Every structure is written in structure tokens, then in C-alpha cells.
Amino acid sequence: MNHSADQADDVLRISMDAKAIVKVGPFARGGKSRVQVEATDHDFQPEATVTPVGIFLPTLDELFVYGITSKVTSDCLVDRIVQWWETVRERFAHITTLVINRDNGPENHSRRTQFMQRLVEFVRQYHIRVQLAYYPPYHSKYNPIERCWGILENHWNGALLDSIEAVLAFTRTMTWNGVHPVVELVTTTYQTGVKLTKEAMDRVEAQLQRLPHLEKWFVDIPYPPPTSWDT
């Protein structure tokens, strides 16, 4: 799937994931620093938290990172796809299909009602086909963006991430194959627990095409839509 997507001129593959929550404060992070830093002996209540959410383009070595100060919800994740697409859509005007590599996390798995509803809305709004290609349990390490997170972790190990600005600054100065990421701060507050009724999800489900025998792991949201879609 990934290979065929990368070979097609009108298909763009992205790898997306959220990194572990970063606690902001004078906390020890391990590693070594060229300058002397002092960390607390114990991890007390953090001043804030930031969750890096990344979108990586494997064939172009481009990385976009969004520092989320709220909970990372289904709405948050789809909003990041929208935010990213708005910045690149003119450059990728020839793209008709977006393939998204993801792990099967709680906020973005293919049975998560709000996540799937928002993606259907994205397809309709931007007139682009979306295909979700999930990694099965214990295989998320093969998602390409995980390599980027490893580079970032090594980059800021030994540093004090004692402010949100410090987290963003270290993220901006990391490099992937010599290229710095595009980094944005997102302070929107997201509500948790948003979900559709069974009837509403049934309508969404009618707009999805699931691969037989791999229904949870590969989902196609076509455009133009099937004639059964509501107008």
C-alpha cells in the first residue's frame, strides 16, 4: 500500500502521530547538555503540558509539528490535518488521494465515531479522497514519524524544557535529514468524550469503504462520494 502510494503522481502519503506528553518545568530528562543545567530532584506538578502532534511526509522528508496544550482529541487531530492541508494544498493541487499512516490509538481508530465523522467532512470540504492505513498493535514503531520523534527526543535530552517556548524552540532546531520542521503552537481547548449516536454513525459508516478482512486497518473515504451519500 505505502509503496504504491509513493509511486503514484496523484497520491500523497503522510504519517501522523502524537508524541508522549511533555511536562513543562525544571524536570530532569536524562541525557547530556553542553551547558550546565539544574533540575529538580523530584517531578512535581508541571507548570503546563505540551503534546507534539506531527505530520510527516516520508517521500519529501518534510515534518510539521503542532504543540498542543489541550487534550489531544479526535477533533484536535482532524483540525491538525485541516491546518496542515490549508498550508500546502496549493502546492499539492494535483493530489487527488491522501493516504494517512496511523497507529490505532484511542482518539483516531477507525471505529472512533467523531474522528470518522470529521474525516468525512474533510473529504467533502476539500474534494479529496482519504485512505486510512493503520498499523496493528505493537507495530506502531514502523510508522515513519516515529523515527522523527526519536530524533527530537535525542535533540532535547539533557535540556530543561521549563517553558512552552523552550519546547517549541527545541523542536524548531531539530533536523530531519538536514531539514528543520515547521512548528506551530495550538492553544485551542478541546472537549473530551464527543461521540455520535448509533444512528449518526450508521450514516457515516455508509460513506466508508472498509477492506474485507481488514476492516479496522484500512478504510477508504472516496471522492466523488457514492450516490448513497446525503447531500
Task: Describe the role of every protein-language-model region.
Residues L132-N154:
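RNase H-like two-metal-ion nuclease catalytic core shared by retroviral integrases
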Residues F115-A133:
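Two-metal-ion acidic nuclease core segments, chiefly of the RNase H-like superfamily
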Residues I14-S15, T97-N104, L132-P137, F170-T171:
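Extended hydrophobic secondary-structure segments that form protein cores and membrane-embedded regions
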Residues M1-E38:
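Charge-mixed, compositionally biased segments that are often intrinsically disordered regulatory tracts
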Residues E38-N101, P106:
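Electropositive, glycine- and tryptophan-enriched low-complexity nucleic-acid-binding patches
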Residues R102-F115, P136-Y142:
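Acidic, metal-coordinating catalytic cores used for nucleic-acid/nucleotide bond scission
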